[in-house]
């Protein structure tokens, strides 16, 4: 039987007491930042990212605590930071290239959205964060642009290479989300850019949201609010749906109790 020599070099993370202490300083600072982010109060609003499940948004509006609190995870935080960097890079490139055809989201809302007087708009770099009071919704817009004589909503998604490489259409879990964004902004056309976080590859898919879909989306928002006011849970996802799991839904356990 042959024995392999262990390669302990892969386990080495520091080479002196000073480097050990400095590594601990870096990791402690990172953990503190993540914990502070996790401790921020959760808003009782509809989240378009959960638009595929009315019941999940019902729990959010009711202020129900998730099944288990979030814990510090440097891996997830790093992935989020990489995703943010990808967004910022693409947004900067597109703004510089499109010039006047890269639209001011705040101005577009003021001109085209009837709920403008009932919202707050914050600019974070080239991302626009929007909070509406009625119905209570918070969302972020990656961009609005004029392309081929149409107004398009831009949505940027990032993923690992293996997931990105197999994409031939928008991921189903993202469609309800972008449909919500488009409906809120009353925009019928969407360009979805998917970027591989490892090598930077890009794919782009177009979606069209009909006026009927926009109306149905708004009706759903108001229905969820009405059910939350009455403390009556709407229907959740059908049995067997892959998104109805403890890993995908923060209210999976509580959902079974309601």
Predicted features and spans:
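Short, glycine/acidic-rich beta->alpha junctions
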Residues: 135-136, 170-175
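Short connector loops/turns at beta-strand edges and beta->alpha or beta->beta junctions
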Residues: 63-64, 157-161, 195-199
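Metal-dependent nuclease catalytic regions and adjoining charged, substrate-binding loops involved
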Residues: 4, 10-13, 166-171, 184-258
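Metal-dependent nuclease catalytic cores that hydrolyze phosphodiester bonds in DNA/RNA
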Residues: 1-153
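Short beta-strand-loop-alpha-helix junction that forms the active-site gateway
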Residues: 156-170
């Amino acid at each position: 039987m042959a024995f392999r020599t262990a390669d302990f070099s892969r386990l080495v993370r520091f080479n002196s007491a000073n480097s050990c202490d400095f590594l601990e300083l870096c990791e402690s600072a990172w953990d503190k930042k993540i914990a502070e982010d996790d401790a921020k109060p959760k808003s009782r609003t509809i989240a378009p990212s959960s638009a595929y499940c009315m019941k999940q948004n019902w729990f959010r509006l009711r202020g129900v605590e998730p099944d288990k609190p979030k814990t510090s995870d440097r891996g997830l935080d790093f992935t989020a930071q990489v995703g943010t960097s990808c967004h910022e890079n693409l947004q900067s490139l597109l703004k510089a290239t499109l010039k006047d055809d890269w639209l001011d989201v705040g101005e577009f809302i003021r001109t085209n959205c009837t709920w403008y007087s009932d919202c707050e708009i914050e600019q974070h770099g080239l991302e626009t964060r929007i909070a509406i009071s009625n119905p209570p919704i918070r969302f972020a817009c990656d961009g609005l642009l004029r392309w081929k004589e149409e107004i398009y909503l831009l949505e940027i998604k990032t993923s690992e290479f293996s997931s990105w490489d197999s994409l031939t259409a928008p991921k189903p879990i993202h469609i309800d989300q972008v449909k919500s964004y488009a409906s809120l902004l009353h925009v019928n056309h969407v360009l979805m850019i998917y970027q591989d976080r490892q090598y930077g590859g890009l794919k782009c898919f177009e979606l069209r949201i009909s006026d009927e879909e926009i109306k149905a989306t708004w009706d759903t928002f108001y229905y969820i609010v009405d059910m939350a006011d009455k403390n009556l849970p709407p229907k959740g996802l059908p049995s067997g749906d892959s998104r109805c799991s403890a890993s995908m839904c923060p209210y999976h356990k509580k959902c079974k109790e309601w």
